[in-house]
């Protein structure tokens, strides 16, 4: 199992290598899903790859944002650079980037980013069919789904430690719609960490705990996971060192048959360096609802070290439960809020009283809890981790009348360098100890001397000659190690022309959830699409009977493999009634659907190469990303591809795997078997909302699957670009979600020109996303 560590900058990269990472993932200066990380410019990236490869650490580079048409040429330049410097893999989300990478740089290893929302075996099969060598699975996958996915023949990578996105991977538009900063383009403003009101209680209902699966590595290994990914490209180097070192030791122990769960000291260290809401074991290990979300706290919680026993003026006496050291960062949780300070005083042991000096603005009292946010000793330990030296053997041959020769090997690569002809000694001949003194001076190199053999007799060798030989051997062995670990140079093929397959014109579409919405929209568009609330077998059969012949079925964005099997069977069984299907995720292209299909909004498309890719895969139409502006749509629509444009409807801001209703009740088990909504329980999600600090109300809609519910967080207002899309001549996509019969009829009237306008927002039409 690969220990894959984050490297947001050079210091973090060095920390990862020092801590025992097998591979690192990092971002180039552009097109990375963590634009806020330091990332690497071109020269830094070249140096980083050489440095990592010298230490036999792989480098994965993220090019995993959605790309606009005007950026595609720049992305190809980046791919060319990554191919040239021979990075070990490139992570992508955008289908246009995937297509260009596979066509122009066929030898460049491509990994499916978690943003691609690959969440079942069918999705991994799609990745394999497209020539990708690894899939980073969505964080919501269960261990059973991971095991099925691992049988598809490519590597599986899972997130094992750190912060979690609360929305289903790749399916979040909240930051984009509310603030214009797109998470799909690396600029998420994290509205999930804000407070919202649910049923009158204000809390962080969208803020997940950090995950820690350090103790679950054997189960993940058994499931077929090839790489455990540690989150943290925005974290400090000391965090990277601490986490990567912990997982390094655990993986080594597992491989040696001596695995043990982390003891209290190690787990405390993991919590101390950074933990939000304590830790959860992740969806893979069965975390659910209140076990996923920590409504009480959105930031680093640290480790509790004691309570205030007495406070007066600028001083507090704290009874310690853990040792306290000079320089520790503390947080006192007072009635007025959290107060943070740096402890300056004597190191004090648990059980004793520590005197803490307070700033004038801090008001605390007896009983207030004190937490340590940073441990100075832990940080010093993390900084002290040295990059391991590379053990090397040397063999020196120095005989008079023959060239001086030094062979140096690390056990895999070997180099021999020669010097001038050796002269006979006139007085004192070179000894083995003389040679060791000169050749062993390796402190300014990545090597350490493991063994030295010297063959000599009566030779005079100047110290300067030995030093020169040592320098040349070290330099050549470093180059040999890099070359041995670096994949072969790849070829570049020219990009093909942007030519779309022959397809019918884009259809206008109306997507409905209910029978009354379907009645209102009947005949209003070329295609009527049914997006069920309930995907269980009985509900699908009865719901389809209420729909007109020729209706298209919208597939869910996320579902387990067995659910997709059941949907496949349902589609085949009802092929005579269904007009076709709308795919909910790109991974659903991993199986053959014997009915017409189109690409829905769950497959984000921002550029023409992505359109080309999906049409080549057999889609009859493609849905444009709702993050495109009107001007960007004009570029996308050049040459009139069969692209439908989101025109009316509440934007799905998030697709949640946890249920706010169950989280509110503190439930941590029983998600799949929950029947609160079915039984119309007063505690059910139906009709509930989240309200932000400004009073904006966001509806919550459930989507029932056999494996349990997903929850759709909808925008407060519908997008309404009916007039703009009509004037542009695009094929509109109308999406009805919360509309009742009258509201649905009003939407129809506006479409038919019988009403002038409806309430709504233009979304990004006049406001391009960052």
Describe these PLM feature segments.
Residues 100:
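Short acidic/His/Gly/Ser-rich catalytic and metal-binding motifs that mark active-site loops
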Residues 37:
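A short acidic, glycine-rich active-site loop
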Residues 1-18, 23-34, 46-49, 55-83, ...:
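Surface-exposed amphipathic alpha-helical tracts and adjacent flexible/coil segments at the periphery
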Residues 9, 65, 93-97, 116-118, ...:
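Short glycine-enriched loops at secondary-structure junctions
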Residues 121-122:
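Conserved nucleotide-cofactor-binding alpha/beta core module
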Residues 40-45:
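Glycine-rich, highly charged phosphate/nucleotide-binding loops
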